């Protein structure tokens, strides 16, 4: 039986030792590349954070460009980064069209004559009311408010506004209505309280203003977004270098043993 040369044994041992080292090093290198690939989309997603598209347009999710809205179909009325424009409002059957929808303004609708809509009925137009018996109308019905009525005093009552003074025609022999009271304050009589004015004197703490987050020198700034990028000299790269050095040492030992 032929004897296996020492050189062949030496080559087999070297291959058996270096293959696991190279395989492990390749796996470590692939793991180092993964964080770099995940950071790229995150940076692209925040690249338009400080920019906004003008009114009448929106931000495209695919290209990041500002796409214009369609006249009469959708709109945006302020700077934005919306993925799409807002659809124009369509006036209901109980409303009339006041102004059309543009790229920067929605449709304006209002209730038809004889109807109104206010805070109590924002979803629909209601029919204007009529003053009940014993009351007179002081304001007309509009598209945004119902009529206003007040009680009627006497047959010849004259009403100017809801808060107006009442004028009554008196016939001879009828006691005249009491005259308006005039509040004249004599010395020593406390005057009616005037409107309260908030005036701060020196030493009085002023009302708290809006809180402004300002960092002074030496104050840690808010944490920024983490970017996982490994540079040469990080633990992963050092590990790869250590594996290579170990393989070289093993190779030298084998040379000393078999040669």
From Swiss-Prot:
Q: How does it sit in the membrane?
A: Lipid-anchor; GPI-anchor
Please give the Pfam families that the UniProt record associates with this protein: TNFR_c6
Question: Where would I find the TNFR-Cys repeats?
Answer: 29-66, 69-109, 110-149
Highest taxon above the source species: Eukaryota
Which of UniProt's keywords are assigned here?
Apoptosis, Cell membrane, Disulfide bond, Glycoprotein, GPI-anchor, Lipoprotein, Membrane, Receptor, Repeat, Signal
Q: Where is the lipid attached (GPI-anchor amidated alanine)?
A: 236
- Residues cleaved off as propeptide: 237-259
Any one GO cellular component localisation term in the record: cell surface
Tell me, which GO biological process terms does this entry list? positive regulation of apoptotic process; TRAIL-activated apoptotic signaling pathway
Composition bias of kind Polar residues appears in 30-45
Which residues are modified by glycosylation?
77, 140, 156
Which InterPro entries does the UniProt entry name for this protein? TNFR/NGFR_Cys_rich_reg (IPR001368), TNFR_10 (IPR020465), TNFRSF10 (IPR052491), TNFRSF10_N (IPR034024)
Which Cys pairs are S-S linked?
Answer: 53-66, 69-85, 88-101, 91-109, 111-125, 128-141, 131-149
Outline the segment boundaries, as ranges, of region: Disordered.
30-56, 160-224
- Start and end residues of the TAPE repeats are 162-176, 177-191, 192-206, 207-221, 222-236
Indicate the transmembrane segments per the record: none
Major location category of this protein: membrane
Q: In which tissues is it expressed?
A: Higher expression in normal tissues than in tumor cell lines. Highly expressed in peripheral blood lymphocytes, spleen, skeletal muscle, placenta, lung and heart.
Q: How is it modified after translation?
A: N-glycosylated and O-glycosylated.
Q: A Gene Ontology molecular-function term? A: TRAIL binding
- Localisation: Cell membrane
Question: Per its database record, what is this protein's job?
Answer: Receptor for the cytotoxic ligand TRAIL. Lacks a cytoplasmic death domain and hence is not capable of inducing apoptosis. May protect cells against TRAIL mediated apoptosis by competing with TRAIL-R1 and R2 for binding to the ligand.
Q: Which protein is depicted?
A: Tumor necrosis factor receptor superfamily member 10C
- What organism, scientifically named, is this protein from? Homo sapiens
